[in-house]
Amino acid sequence: MAKHVKVAVTGAAGQIGYALLFRLASGQAFGLDTTVDLHLLEIEPALPALKGVVMELEDCAFPLLRNMVVTSDPRVAFNDVNWALLVGAAPRKAGMERKDLLEKNGSIFAGQGKAINENAASDVRIFVVGNPCNTNCLIAMNNAPDIPKDRFYAMTRLDQNRAIGQLALKAGVDVPSVKNMIIWGNHSSTQYPDFYHATIDGKPATEVIRDKNWLLNDFIPVIQQRGAAVIKARGASSAASAANAALDSVWSLINTTPADDNYSVALCAQGRYGVDEGLIFSFPCRTENGVVSVIEEIEHNEFGQQKLKETLDELREERDAVEALGLI
């Protein structure tokens, strides 16, 4: 029997939104057996541009796209949705401190969390792309007390995909040869791209890529700073690759994970790996019959433990900052 899903996308007229919507409407996230309603949220000044995007979506005549709602009201956007993809966020501008960005986005995500809590379908799942995504997700989660905490996710799949791409290039193999590439912690420059547990053609990555200096001193910083490198080269932030990673994430959260692999997503820590209860932290995950679970038996060497501490400390600082602002 055909399935149907209602999906809210915030920041729908932005660059990531533009790269995301056409692929969503074509079935790339929810499958070719699932029809889609799109609820598109934008700020008032961007509504004319969003109407242009809607015209283009109509002009594609996607068989799976049933209905579209265009609005600047979060209550309308999140009404009865099964998925909320929180893409829109205030960008960091020159001279802006991270705490300023947290405050500006905090009010946005607090409001959206409340609107989701009051209006979304009972089975809603929330996936945050807008940065700083871990802490924006934390804010939304804390403002939606009626929704189970395990329904909130933040995107680190872009980091995972970046890491897989770099390992494949270095090893001279095709991308599908690289598996179990884990991103731990925050989607920021403190993230820990864990090559120690990655495999290449079924062997430990460290056996295939024997250049330890490259792994430690080139690979990790490249992944941690890839977003900034894209901005420097392109003059704009990652859009198509971010949209692609969001689609990959939704697919992985819904569909059973292959037995020999895992995927990375940030979710509510629930005390795992010594991470504070309630923080949104990226872990290796698997999906089985629609149930998402964290892989819990992974052990870290001293280097890995230090990297986990660095990213955890940053997430604690961000939490404390938004707590002080009264956002959670």
UniProtKB/Swiss-Prot annotation:
PROSITE patterns: MDH. CDD domains: MDH_chloroplast-like. Disulfide bonds: none annotated. InterPro entries: L-lactate/malate_DH, Lactate/malate_DH_C, Lactate/malate_DH_N, Lactate_DH/Glyco_Ohase_4_C, Malate_DH_AS, Malate_DH_type2, NAD(P)-bd_dom_sf. SUPFAM superfamilies: LDH C-terminal domain-like, NAD(P)-binding Rossmann-fold domains. One of its GO terms (molecular function) is L-malate dehydrogenase (NAD+) activity. Substrate binds at residues 92, 98, 131, 162. This is Malate dehydrogenase. It comes from Coxiella burnetii (strain CbuG_Q212) (Coxiella burnetii (strain Q212)). The gene is mdh.
